Regions:
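Active-site mouth loops of central-metabolism enzymes
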Residues: 7-23, 77-85, 165-175, 230-233, ...
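Hydrophobic faces of well-ordered beta-strands that scaffold small-molecule active sites
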Residues: 3-7, 40-42, 72-74, 102-106, ...
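Short, acidic/polar
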Residues: 19-31, 90, 175-182, 287-296
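Internal, glycine-rich beta/alpha segment that forms the wall or movable "lid"
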Residues: 1, 83-190, 200-207, 211-220, ...
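N-terminal beta1-alpha1-beta2 module of alpha/beta enzyme domains
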Residues: 1-66, 70-71, 166-169
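An alpha-helical appendage that flanks or caps ligand/catalytic pockets
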Residues: 5-7, 123-159, 200-303, 313, ...
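Glycine-rich, proline-tolerant flexible connector loops at the mouths of alpha/beta enzymes
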Residues: 39-63, 78, 196-199, 308-320
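Alpha-helix-loop-beta-strand connector modules within alpha/beta enzyme cores
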Residues: 53-74, 128, 132, 323-337
Length: 337
């Protein structure tokens, strides 16, 4: 099983100088690479108050220049907000800069503020995503592209750049709600499940995904990815104590701002009791216990786990110590699964 280092929006606006934030995150990248993580995953949002965050394409292009062969992923890019022609050519360019190490994770997004800012509708996200991806695949594989859909139109278009990987980079498609799970299965893409679904829901949704793949005649893709909030310490008691302090601020902000665009179960969990959310969805404990919890997802068919190791107002030294502990006792255990 492979393990990825997940970077999300966790730095509270104004709590850290932006240049210091970048230098800290660059140091975290180098530490996670040296720790043996297989992939470095960078999230994507706009106007995500109260956090400050950098955009994925320039970040991943910069990281591609670092030594090593760590894979680089968008986790996930909010495709319905963007123009697919621009995304297709940005991805092709970045894939060459990465020399084929790019993974393109795609998702719908869940925030009305972002849809409003980009002139799209929440209700159109699924349709826009499907059509945009179809058009991007044409731009990556066809010499001349003609496309006349609901949202996008091209006539006799000739792509400017093709990806390094053939026919194009590996895709991960995010889904939280059952309709989104069905859409990913219907289109035959690898499934990427985010950090808030509880285990029993995931088990049911994996069954739904496989049923949908079979219904539409698709083989089971090679990859299936799970993202989890994560905190490891020398023992479970210390891990729970440190995790609670780290998670509290982040999920207090999620609760205050709501968690839109998912099903009712997800909304109630993310805006409800933190202790229940931790019990249901997070990986927390000593090193062996963390590996055992990850193994449960391996048993469901996941071959990739992406973990978030730092949270609002976590000192950089604590982040680096956390990476060091995970490198010593968790990464090797996950690789053996």
């Amino acid at each position: 099983m492979e393990i990825a280092y997940q970077v999300g929006q966790v730095v509270i606006r104004g709590s850290l100088d932006l240049q210091q934030q970048w230098q800290d995150q660059l140091a975290q990248f180098r530490a996670s690479r040296d720790a043996g993580f297989d992939t470095y995953c960078w999230a994507h949002h706009y106007l995500i108050d109260p956090f400050q965050h950098f955009q994925p394409f320039p970040v991943l292009a910069r990281l591609a220049a670092e030594p090593g062969n760590m894979k680089l992923a968008t986790s996930v890019l909010l495709l319905p907000l963007l123009n697919p022609v621009d995304v297709a050519e940005q991805v092709a360019t970045l894939d060459h800069i990465c020399e084929g190490r790019l993974i393109l994770g795609l998702g719908l997004g869940y925030r009305p503020e972002e849809c409003e800012a980009f002139g799209t509708q929440m209700s159109e996200r699924g349709a826009r995503h499907s059509e945009a991806l179809e058009l991007m695949q044409k731009l990556w594989t066809e010499d001349e592209v003609n496309h006349h859909g609901r949202f996008y139109h091209l006539t006799g278009a000739h792509p400017t750049a093709r990806p390094y990987q053939k026919p194009y980079p590996k895709l991960w498609l995010a889904a939280m709600s059952d309709p989104a799970i069905r859409r990913v299965g219907r289109e035959g893409h690898p499934l990427f499940i985010g950090p808030v679904q509880p285990y029993n829901t995931i088990r049911r949704q994996v069954d739904l995904y496989h049923q949908t793949l079979e219904e539409y005649g698709h083989p089971i893709p090679e990859d299936m990815v799970i993202v989890r909030e994560f905190f490891c310490a020398e023992n479970r008691e210390d891990a729970l104590d440190k995790a609670r302090r780290g998670f509290e601020r982040k999920y207090a902000e999620y609760s205050a701002h709501g968690f839109q665009g998912t099903d009712e179960e997800m909304t109630s969990k993310i805006t409800g009791d933190l202790e229940a959310l931790m019990d249901d969805t997070f990986i927390v404990g000593g090193p062996d216990e963390c590996v055992e919890q990850i193994a449960r997802y391996r048993d469901l068919g996941f071959n990739q786990v992406s973990i978030r190791l730092f949270y609002p107002e976590t000192p950089q030294k604590d982040v680096m110590d956390h990476i060091e502990l995970v490198a010593k006792d968790v990464v090797p255990g996950v690789h053996k699964l």
